[in-house]
Amino acid sequence: MNIKNVVVIGSGTMGSGIAAQLCNANVSVTLLDLKTEISEKAKKKILESKPPLLIDKSKIDNIKAGNIEDNFGTVEKADWVVEREVERINIKHNLYQKILKVRKKESIISSNTSTIPLKVLSEKMSHEDKKDFCITHFFNPVRYMALLEIVSEDINDVKKINFLKIFCEDSLGKGVIICKDTPGLLGNRVGVYA
């Protein structure tokens, strides 16, 4: 398995930050939102961000902007699809069904949420699809915050989760912890009491 092509759905602060960190690692990224103009605006914000999200401004060429209607076919070629949509479960469930219909079988699907439990996110998925689905909770700003929480279930393909962990450590420079499926995960819970 290898991660060379990633689709990030949702180009807000977190989605664009994840896309930027992936392109810093020379990964080809497609950044999708409701309209291509929104994704293009996110690319512009990445270039203008302070502190900079890119290690070199030329890295922005690794990101293609698009929309979830016209460019959804990019999901078919993605090694990893990262969902960063609004925290509304019905929207997420509908999006996952669309992703799961077209994605290549060996791909990883993840959500960047820390507020909705993995069991709730995956409740409408088949047994097979649940094996490839997890939470990858990045912190903002993605380039500078070292922590990444990965939440998986017993049903997950352990080899894929371990591969994703190593990829995020080695290629994205993250300190990865595997968390239980609890509200707020670990980082947010510790932060509340710090």
Residue ranges and their predicted role:
Residues H127-D129, L147-T182, G191-A194:
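Internal alpha-helical scaffold of NAD(P)-dependent oxidoreductase catalytic cores
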Residues I9, G17, G66, R84, ...:
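Structural motif
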Residues M1-S49, V102:
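NAD(P)+-binding Rossmann beta1-loop-alpha1 motif at the extreme N-terminus of oxidoreductases
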Residues A20-N24, S58-W80, F163-G173, I178-G184:
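Amphipathic alpha-helical segments at domain termini/boundaries
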Residues L31-K57, I150-K159, V176, T182-N188:
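Rossmann-like dinucleotide-binding cores of NAD(P)H-dependent redox enzymes
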Residues E106-S111, S122-F139, K174-G175:
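Rossmann-fold dehydrogenase core element
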Residues L34-K41, P52-I109, T115-V120, L148:
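Rossmann-like NAD(P)-binding element
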